[in-house]
């Protein structure tokens, strides 16, 4: 795994254009900024082309979608393809809300996505496989997570991150698992949104190998969270959220390498 991409990201300070979830937009902006990327958000379709042109990558989040925003997503996705900018899709709650799944599938047919990042329920829904999702949470099911992720990647010809206690990253054939992290991520709304945008940041500095970028993104965020949790003396979700921003700013390649649990 090319963990030196973290240093590359910090040296290049890539702009990440986010069509954001308004519930978590501040956390995403702060996390990207701390890591070394430059976040930019917009809900205005009239400036879509300029935003795509100046960005290194685009992250499209379905968290708080509206009809107007869906139109913007479609325009932005097509422009990103036109200008050869990587696109990351976060299909929030598509496993629990049929309309969201309908929207996500329509977007995936309108433009090419480079990475889809979702939990088990979301990825299973896109792949057409059985899973009982629970709102924005993964829910439960009996399917093999690797097979679910691979099926989704093959169907949409992209890289897929099925995130959870162990992140599964696949391009449809190759598979990497990242087992770092902490249960405190599940107590912090927006952890998945932040991961999706961090993935976009890494694809901006590795556009020809988004599979590698996805792996590094998962390991950096999971590793940073694990390091924060190891210093806490109690279950403190709010402290974790604040300290995570600090750690994203300070974490080094060597620190991540030391604790990496990658299969």
UniProtKB/Swiss-Prot annotation:
Family matches, as InterPro entries: Hyethyz_kinase, Ribokinase-like
Chain sites annotated for binding ATP: 117, 163
Source lineage: Bacteria, Bacillati, Bacillota, Bacilli, Lactobacillales
Gene: thiM
Pathway the protein acts in: Cofactor biosynthesis; thiamine diphosphate biosynthesis; 4-methyl-5-(2-phosphoethyl)-thiazole from 5-(2-hydroxyethyl)-4-methylthiazole: step 1/1
Species per Swiss-Prot/TrEMBL record: Lactiplantibacillus plantarum (strain ATCC BAA-793 / NCIMB 8826 / WCFS1) (Lactobacillus plantarum)
Cofactor(s) annotated in UniProt: Mg(2+)
Regions annotated as coiled coil: none
Top-level enzyme category: transferase
Binding site for substrate: 41, 190
Domain of life: Bacteria
NCBIfam families reported in the protein's UniProt record: PRK09355.1
GO MF annotation: an example: magnesium ion binding
Catalyzed reaction equations: 5-(2-hydroxyethyl)-4-methylthiazole + ATP = 4-methyl-5-(2-phosphooxyethyl)-thiazole + ADP + H(+)
Keywords carried by this UniProt record: ATP-binding, Kinase, Magnesium, Metal-binding, Nucleotide-binding, Thiamine biosynthesis, Transferase
Record's protein name: Hydroxyethylthiazole kinase
CDD domains found in the cross-reference section: THZ_kinase
Enzyme Commission numbers on file: 2.7.1.50
Similarity field: Belongs to the Thz kinase family.
GO biological process, one term: thiamine diphosphate biosynthetic process
Summary of the function given for this chain in its UniProt record: Catalyzes the phosphorylation of the hydroxyl group of 4-methyl-5-beta-hydroxyethylthiazole (THZ).
């Amino acid at each position: 795994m090319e963990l030196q991409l973290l240093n590359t990201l910090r040296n290049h300070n890539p702009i990440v254009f986010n069509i954001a979830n308004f519930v978590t937009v501040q956390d995403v902006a702060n996390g990207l900024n701390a890591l070394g990327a430059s976040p930019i958000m917009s809900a205005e379709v009239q400036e879509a082309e300029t935003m795509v042109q100046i960005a290194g990558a685009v992250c499209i989040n379905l968290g708080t979608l509206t009809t107007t925003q869906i139109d913007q997503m479609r325009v932005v996705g097509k422009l990103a393809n036109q200008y050869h900018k990587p696109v990351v899709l976060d299909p929030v709650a598509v496993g629990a809300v049929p309309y969201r799944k309908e929207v996500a599938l329509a977007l995936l047919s309108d433009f090419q996505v480079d990475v889809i990042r979702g939990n088990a329920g979301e990825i299973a829904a896109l792949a057409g496989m059985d899973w009982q999702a629970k709102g924005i949470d993964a829910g439960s099911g009996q399917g093999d997570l690797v097979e679910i992720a691979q099926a989704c990647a093959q169907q949409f010809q992209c890289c897929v991150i099925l995130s959870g206690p162990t992140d599964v990253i696949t391009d449809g054939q190759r598979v990497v698992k990242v087992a770092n992290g902490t249960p405190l991520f599940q107590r912090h709304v927006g952890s998945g949104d932040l991961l999706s945008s961090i993935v976009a940041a890494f694809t901006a500095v590795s556009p020809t190998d988004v599979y590698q970028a996805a792996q590094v993104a998962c390991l950096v965020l999971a590793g940073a969270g694990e390091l924060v949790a190891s210093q806490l003396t109690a279950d403190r979700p709010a402290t974790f959220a604040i300290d995570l921003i600090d750690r994203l700013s300070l974490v080094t390649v060597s620190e991540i390498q030391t604790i990496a649990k990658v299969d």
